Amino acid sequence: MEKRDELYAGKAKSVYRTDDPQRLILHFRDDTSAFDGKKKESLARKGMVNNKFNAFIMEKLQAAGIPTHFEKLIADDECVVKNLEMIPVECVVRNVAAGGLVRRLGVEEGQTLTPPTFELFLKDDAHGDPMINESLAETFGWATPEQLATMKALTFKVNDVLKQLFLDGGMLLVDYKLEFGLFDGEVMLGDEFSPDGCRLWDANTREKMDKDRFRQGLGGVIEAYEEVGRRIGISF
């Protein structure tokens, strides 16, 4: 497969076209950012760690019957994915109160959420990725009711698989965001799953093992990512 021109550069990944119009290459960079890009840093090994972490998780989800865009690793920091028509709506599940939920509602951080909450956000950096609902998504054409129903069902299926995976490694899957797209009309999981896009706490100590270490200046960001991976069986 031939890597061609850069299609898009995000905050931490670059997307490249290939000689196959239905396939793309994702390049995971060492860049990290927070607070809508106001805090930025380059962290050695991050691209490699997130690429391998994402591949491991995507393969677990595929084995559980969840369709994803992931196809294969081709380098320490690159993988091949299907070229999805992305749906501009993020799905967020929260198992434990943290982050934006605590700020919005004033609830206590660390409270177990039963049942888990499900939220939708519009992918729109210029407006701070605002929270939306199904009605808005349908009215403005961001997603159809059928697509939203499939996205919600898949998001909760991901929760069933990954909550147990991380719990077996002594960790709590606090919350996470997912993005979906269409491939030949089928809704499938896109983007990535890594500690950049979820919250993970040690189940006993509640130590933060995710991107909050960067947001809050706790240090040891990549070491924490690698420890999460080690606990669930990833070899870096």
Swiss-Prot record:
Reactions catalysed, semicolon-separated, are: 5-amino-1-(5-phospho-D-ribosyl)imidazole-4-carboxylate + L-aspartate + ATP = (2S)-2-[5-amino-1-(5-phospho-beta-D-ribosyl)imidazole-4-carboxamido]succinate + ADP + phosphate + 2 H(+)
Report the domain of life of the source organism: Bacteria
Signal sequence extent: none
List where the protein spans the membrane.
none
Q: Name one GO biological process term.
A: cobalamin biosynthetic process
Q: CDD domains per the record?
A: SAICAR_synt_PurC
Q: Return the similarity comment.
A: Belongs to the SAICAR synthetase family.
UniProt-listed PANTHER family = MULTIFUNCTIONAL PROTEIN ADE2, SI:DKEY-6E2.2
In its UniProt entry, what is this protein called?
A: Phosphoribosylaminoimidazole-succinocarboxamide synthase
Q: Which organism is it from?
A: Chromohalobacter salexigens (strain ATCC BAA-138 / DSM 3043 / CIP 106854 / NCIMB 13768 / 1H11)
Q: Which gene encodes it?
A: purC
